[in-house]
Design a protein with these regions (language model features):
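Conserved donor-binding/catalytic core segment of Leloir-type glycosyltransferases
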Residues: 34, 73-91, 97-100
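Aromatic "clamp/platform" in nucleotide-sugar-dependent glycosyltransferases that forms part
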Residues: 160
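Short, small-residue-biased leader/transition segments that mark boundaries at the very start
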Residues: 3-4
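A charged, aromatic-enriched C-terminal amphipathic alpha-helix characteristic of glycosyltransferases
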Residues: 68, 208-211, 225-257
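Short hydrophobic beta-strand element within catalytic cores of glycosyltransferases
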Residues: 177-181
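Donor nucleotide-sugar binding/catalytic pocket of nucleotide-sugar-dependent glycosyltransferases
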Residues: 8, 28-70
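Nucleotide-activated donor-binding/catalytic signature segment of Leloir-type glycosyltransferases, i.e.
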Residues: 125-142
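Membrane-proximal helix-turn-helix segments that form the acceptor-binding/catalytic region
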Residues: 14-33
Length: 261
């Protein structure tokens, strides 16, 4: 007797997340599936079509929103970069620090502020101290960022994956230029390559830490020396569809569709 164990997705079988598998396997009993991003919706639709020969109704409704766009009261600080996240290993703020240190050689005006706390804080502090970068890289801790984002020119995220990306949404809502990895799902949702910043294609299994930080540094230099001229405007355009009033309309439309189906 042969027993076949499937442990991965292939051309004929998909291994869904355990949290969602029951619902997906019983899709005929579900009125709607809701995803946080359009990319997730597209991916899920393709998977249902390929593996289940099914086309359930899937709608995109973001899991976060912004009340209004935030504009700077005075000119943004030139050559300023920020990030905001938990200082956790998967966020790789240390990579951004290393990249800024590399880019500083070509852009002496560069500054980088880090907002957040977490278990990686001491590691990040040590990198800053080792390279004597305290004058231009600072850890700011937890703050209410509502009036802070718009003081900066550029936001960088270095997560290898992001289900949505609330701080990315808040950053485009304050008009920042954006740099992040071309990975699912947050960065492609908020970054239009060459328009409001750059998506960095990367093979994390093949690339060394030095390769990764060099690529980020290259994009930082590119942004400030020859970057998209309408980056701030494009970010505000992207943010429009994440305003609370728009999200409320999406929920209203969905509820009406369910009630009158």
């Amino acid at each position: 007797r042969r027993v076949l164990f499937r442990s991965a997705t292939d051309g004929t079988h998909i291994l869904w997340n355990n949290y969602y598998e029951y619902q997906f396997e019983n899709a005929q009993h579900i009125d709607f599936f809701i995803t946080a991003t359009d990319l997730q919706r597209q991916t899920l639709s393709e998977q249902f079509k390929q593996y289940k020969n099914d086309c359930p109704r899937i709608r995109t409704i973001p899991v976060g929103s912004i009340e209004s766009l935030q504009y700077p009261e005075k000119e943004r600080k030139p050559y300023s970069i920020m990030t905001a996240s938990r200082l956790a290993n998967e966020k790789h703020v240390d990579w951004i620090v290393e990249a800024v240190i590399k880019a500083k050689h070509q852009l002496p005006q560069l500054s980088f502020d880090i907002y957040g706390q977490g278990e990686e804080q001491e590691k990040i502090k040590n990198i800053i101290t080792k390279h004597r970068a305290e004058d231009y890289i600072q850890i700011k801790g937890h703050r209410n960022l509502r009036t802070i984002y718009q003081q900066y020119e550029l936001f960088i995220a270095a997560s290898q994956s992001e289900g949505f990306g609330l701080t990315l949404m808040e950053a485009v809502g304050s008009g920042l230029g954006m740099i992040g990895f071309d990975v699912n799902y947050g960065s492609p949702t908020f970054i239009r390559h060459h328009q409001n910043g750059y998506l960095i294609p990367i093979d994390f299994e093949q690339a060394s830490t030095d390769d990764i930080t060099t690529q980020i540094a290259h994009m930082i230099i590119r942004y400030f020396e020859d970057g998209p001229i309408r980056a701030h405007e494009v970010s505000y355009d992207i943010a429009e569809s994440f305003k609370t009033s728009h999200i409320v309309d999406l929920w209203r439309q969905l509820i009406e569709e369910v009630l009158y189906d």
